[in-house]
């Protein structure tokens, strides 16, 4: 939260330093784990009957809102509708160790190595982390919470961008960089290895994700089709924002509870175009209340990127006096 009296907080680069629970945007991690380990297949159906029978009385958001569950859903549908019950069940079946392992496979909880000072690690919910802070008993309810992106899970927006890029590109590790190239005065290009060494020595960070995620295209396709349903099919949690969009988008909304009623952090993650991705977008709005607001921001970003924004920004001289008064 911005505070004009905080002389340090205003300079925080939130993209690389702010760690927030990802909420339902974490569900593609759990989906990847369940499919890749054979716990389910893309056609497996789970019956969301409302309140999950194990854990601590957790229920799907749909049940909380309408008094009934989603009914039988497969994975693609569960992502589209953001069905918590479905992912509670996957979490209960697999356990926290498998979930945390696949989160790490996607680079969550690991620095990207971007050439900026201040990047933080993030936190993957795990027994190891819990033990490190004196939380020595891991309960089933903790796993259910972690499976929908809560519990101890906290990641930076830049980590989330790498994660979504890997979902889009088939699981390939992504070099996160603000440098396209560096050219010496003699016209020769500085090698990637030299740049990485310099960044490590001066900024003190490096890409901590060293391997690709080996997951089948069939399994990733089931996940990505669910993300497409989020934006392009009635009932999708971002359908109202993208229903008339001219380009097919894959997306996922998320609302991460903060402990204060009505002040959930809102997320949107996505990529476009769906068939041949060019851009991954991550939007975080603190205390937004839900992930719906973030989809509007993501749409504006994509409109600008794809040249769909016909409005030109012009200088407004009339605004200068009012701006000066609040500096």
Residue ranges and their predicted role:
Residues 285-288:
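Ligand-site clamp/hinge motif
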Residues 1-23, 29-283, 323-327:
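Beta-lactam-recognizing serine transpeptidase/beta-lactamase-like catalytic domain environment
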Residues 306-327:
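Gram-negative outer-membrane assembly/targeting C-terminal domains
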Residues 278, 290-292, 308:
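Intrinsically disordered, low-complexity acidic/polar segments
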Residues 160, 290-299:
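Short, charged, low-complexity patches
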Residues 168, 299-310:
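Short amphipathic alpha-helical signal-transduction/dimerization elements
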